[in-house]
Amino acid sequence: MENCYCIEPQWPADELLMKYQYISDFFIALAYFSIPLELIYFVKKSAVFPYRWVLVQFGAFIVLCGATHLINLWTFTMHSRTVAVVMTTAKVLTAVVSCATALMLVHIIPDLLSVKTRELFLKNKAAELDREMGLIRTQEETGRHVRMLTHEIRSTLDRHTILKTTLVELGRTLALEECALWMPTRTGLELQLSYTLHQQNPVGYTVPINLPVISQVFSSNRALKISPNSPVASLRPRAGRYVAGEVVAVRVPLLHLSNFQINDWPELSTKRYALMVLMLPSDSARQWRVHELELVEVVADQVAVALSHAAILEESMRARDLLMEQNVALDLARREAETAIRARNDFLAVMNHEMRTPMHAIIALSSLLQETELTPEQRLMVETILKSSNLLATLINDVLDLSRLEDGSLQLDIGTFNLHAVFKEVLNLIKPVTLVKKLSLTLHLGPDLPVFAVGDEKRLMQAILNVVGNAVKFSKEGSISISAIVAKSETFREIRVPDFHPVPSDSHFYLRVQVKDTGSGISPQDIPKLFTKFAQTTVGPRNSGGSGLGLAICKRFVNLMEGHIWLESEGLGKGCTATFIVKLGIADQSNESKLPYTSKIHENSIHTSFPGLKVLVMDDNGVSRSVTKGLLVHLGCEVTTAGSIEEFLRVVSQEHKVVFMDICTPGVDGYELAIRIREKFAKCHERPFMVVLTGNSDKVTKESCLRAGMDGLILKPVSIDKMRSVLSELIERRVLFETS
C-alpha cells in the first residue's frame, strides 16, 4: 500500500456506494410505481385494448419490483428480522408474478405479432383502396368527359359538324397539339386528310391505305401509340421543336348501311374504317395515360354511331326530297288527269245533250208514226227506225254511265222497291224481242224471295236487262230462262274470288240471278274479255257484233252493289250461263207502305188521252219544241210554246196545269226560272206542275231540280208512251193533292 498513489475519497468507499444504491433504489422504486399508474391511465382511455388482465400482471410485477427496491433501502444497514422477512416475502411474490408474466408472454407475443401483421395488411388494403379510389375518380373523370363529348357529338346530325366538333372537343379535353381525321377515298385504296384541328381546309394530303402503321391500327379496336414520324402524323411544324409529343391513332368504323348510299362516302360493301390521329404537345414530358386512351376509344365508337345516324338522316332527307319531287309530279299528273276527266265529262255532257236533242225528234216522231195507219212495209220501217234509235239512246246512256263509273262519280240511289215487279218489268221489256226471234222465255222466282227490297232499283234492272239482253242477242233459237233466288251460304263456298267476301246478316240478303240460254256459247279463253269495253270475241255469228258496253257496265254495277258476276260456257254452240250475286237490304213494313203507286198508274194509262189539258212548253231549240208539242197535241193537250225566257214568263198563267221546260235555255238559269215561277204563284194549288225536259242525265242535274222544287224530270229522247206515262202520273198526283 506504500507505493499506491490512489486519492482518498472524501467519504469512505462503502458509504459512497451505499449512498448511490440508496438514490438508485429510490428512483427505481419511483419509476416502478409510476409505470403502473401510467398503464392504468392509458387503459382507461383506450376502450378497445384486448389485454387488460395482462396489464394487471405487468402492473403487479412492476409494483412488486418497486417494493423490492424500496425495502432494499433498509437492508444496507443493520436491520431487524422483520425487515428481512418483508424483503424475502416481496422477492418471493416478485418471483412468482414475474414467472407468471413470463409464461403469459409466450401466448401474448404471437398475438401482438399478428396484430402487427394485420396492421401491415390493413395498410396494404388502405393503399389498394386509395389506388381503386383514384381509378374510380379517373373513370368518373373519363366518364364525364365521354358524356360531355358524346353530348357535343350528338347535338347535331350533320356529319361534317359531328367530325369537326369531335376534333375540337378532343383537343380541348386532352390538351392536344393537333388532331386529324383521315377518311378513305371512294376507291378504298387511299386515306385522305379530311378534317384537322387547326387547318380549315386540309386538301391534297393522301396516304396509301396499305401502310404497315395503318394496317396495324385497323386490325385492332384499341387506341395504339404510333411513331411521330409516321406519314399520318406529319402534320405539325417541326421548327424549334426538340422532342415531338406522343401520338396515338384509333380506327373509326364506318358502319355498313345496306339501304343507303351517300354520294361522297366510300363504297361500304366491305368493312371500312376512318383513321383518327391525336398528338400531344411537343417539348413536353407528358405521356398518354390509360384512361385517356380509353376515352379516345369510346369517343371513336360514339363518332361511328353518330356518323351512321347522320348518314341515315341524310339519306332520309334525300329520300324525302325525292318523294316531294315525285309527289309534285304526281300532283301535277293528278291535276292533268282531273283536267282531262273534266274535259272528257264536259265533252260527254255536251255530246249527250246535243245527241239527245235530235234523238228526241227521231224517237218522238217515230212513236207518233206508229200510232197512225201504216202499211205493213211502212210499219216495219218505222219500227226499225224506233228500235235503232232506242238502241242508240241506250248506247249513249251506257257511255255516260261507264264514264261516271270510271271516275267514281256514279253512286247508288238507295230506296225501297218491289223486287218481283222489277223482274216482271224486265220480262215485259224483253218478251217482244223473244217473240220476234221465236225464243222461249221463262222466269222463276224463288219461294223465299222477298217481295220488297232496299237498293237501287234502276241499276239492278239495268244489270238484269244487260245480262238478259246479251243472252237474247246471241241466241238464234232455243230458250232463255231467268231465275232469282236468295243466295245461301253453301253458294258462297262455291265462289272463291279474292275481292268478294259476303257476310250474312239480319239486315240484308244476297240476291242470286242466273240467266241460261241455248245460244252460240263462248270460247273459254274469251270469257275474261266479255267484261271489257267493246269486246270483240268469237261469240255467235260475225254479224252479231261485240258485246258492247253492256257486260262491262253490268260488272261495275254489280261491284257497286257489293256483288260478283261470272259467266260459264262449255264452248261454242253450247249455250252460256250468266250468274251474278248482289247485296240488297231487307225492307220493313213502314217502308213498304210508302211505295208509290207507279205500277197502277202505268196499268191504267196505256191508252189514255188528256183532252183540254193546258200545257206550256219552253225550249230554245225549235225542233225539240215542235216535237214535244206534237207529242202533247197527239195526247189531246192544248199546248202553248215559248222559245225564250221573256216569252215564257209573259204567257205562263194559272190556266196552265203542266209546264215543260229545258233548263239549258240561254239567258237565265233554269233553276232560277223555277224559283221565279214558285214566287209568282203564291198559292200552291195555283202553281202549274214544273217538269224538266233535258238531255243532261247526271246526278247533279237531278239533285238541283229537286232543290229548286221541280215536280219531275224527263230525259230526252221521249216517246209517246213515255209522255203519256208522265202526264198520267202528274194528273194522279194532282187528284191526290186536291182530295187530301
UniProtKB/Swiss-Prot annotation:
Residues 158-307 form the GAF domain. It is found in: Endoplasmic reticulum membrane. Keywords: ATP-binding, Copper, Disulfide bond, Endoplasmic reticulum, Ethylene signaling pathway, Kinase, Membrane, Metal-binding, Nucleotide-binding, Phosphoprotein, Receptor, Transferase, Transmembrane, Transmembrane helix, Two-component regulatory system. Binds 1 copper ion per dimer. Activation probably requires a transfer of a phosphate group between a His in the transmitter domain and an Asp of the receiver domain. Residues 614-731 form the Response regulatory domain. One of its GO terms (molecular function) is ethylene binding. Its main location: endoplasmic reticulum. InterPro entries: CheY-like_superfamily, ETR, GAF, GAF-like_dom_sf, HATPase_C_sf, His_kinase_dom, HisK_dim/P_dom, HisK_dim/P_sf. The modification 4-aspartylphosphate is found at residue 662. In seeds and placenta. Its EC number is 2.7.13.3. Residues 350-588 form the Histidine kinase domain. It comes from the Eukaryota. GO terms for biological process: negative regulation of ethylene-activated signaling pathway. Homodimer; disulfide-linked. May act early in the ethylene signal transduction pathway, possibly as an ethylene receptor, or as a regulator of the pathway. This is Ethylene receptor 1. It comes from Cucumis melo var. cantalupensis.
